[in-house]
Amino acid sequence: MAQAKLAVLCLLAAAACSQQGPRMEWKRVAMDGSRTGVVAVNAENVDTALGAFEDDYIAPNGRHFTDGATPEVAAMLMEVQPKMAHLKKVVGHNARFMDNPRTECDLPIGNLVADALRAKAADYFQVPVEFALTNYGGIRIPMPEGAVTLDDIESMFPFKNYMCLAKLRGSELTRLLEQLAKTPAFQAVSGCRVKVKAHELVEAEVDGAPIDPKRLYNVATIDFLLSGGDGIAVGARAEDVKLTSVLMKDVMLDFISAKEAAGEIIDYQKDGRVVMED
């Protein structure tokens, strides 16, 4: 009933506008609430209604509503600001904006994350790590151009995905790459160069050479991908798995901080490590 009344009111308002002046057009803008968890108010029947909001708010005309929860929320936000100040610490610098549409292979942001994972695993386990794999879905927001803050890193990796190391025989590593070739955008990888045509793996090199089916390869990945996350089960293919308590956000933080300490800027582009053709 309430929705019906709202629809009628909106239609009447539209009719009044058409008689008194130019027609009002609403622009739809995509909103990303990944940083704050805020969800935009939206009507179920967007073609006939603008939506309902059952609370007080600050109107677009700037009028300040003193009733309701708004003043209390504002006071709470002011109170926690000092506790959040550390999140604004600059930890590195990025040469260019890096998005994550998850529909393309060889994304710069994915290359960065996979390289960071591979480097961290090699340092942590003190062994050569020939290949690294992580998922685009675990990278939740783009990396901004210019200064990169701790808040950016925390927001990029909100999930508790932990670094791990798996030992895969070359034959199983090839099958893993064949599985990734069937997906729309492969995934974020490091230490390999692959070519895919019509979602079939046609070429693959790891550690600068064709894959030896009998060789054991050290593969850095995340626990989410060990047992079926995103349809990938690295653990089922592995002869040995080592877990850690190292979160992916810390992997990235260490990598970027080391670059910053060395006076280096993060500068990633597509580099052809994964080529997918129709």
Regions found by a protein language model. Name each.
Residues A2-L9:
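Sec-dependent signal peptide recognition
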Residues A85-T103, G231-A238:
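Acidic/histidine-rich, surface-exposed loop or edge segments in extracytoplasmic proteins
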Residues T48-A95:
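N-terminal, post-signal-peptide region of Sec/Tat-exported proteins
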Residues G21-G62, L107, N111-D123, V127-D278:
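Feature captures C-terminal
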Residues A16-C17:
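N-terminal Sec signal peptide cleavage junction
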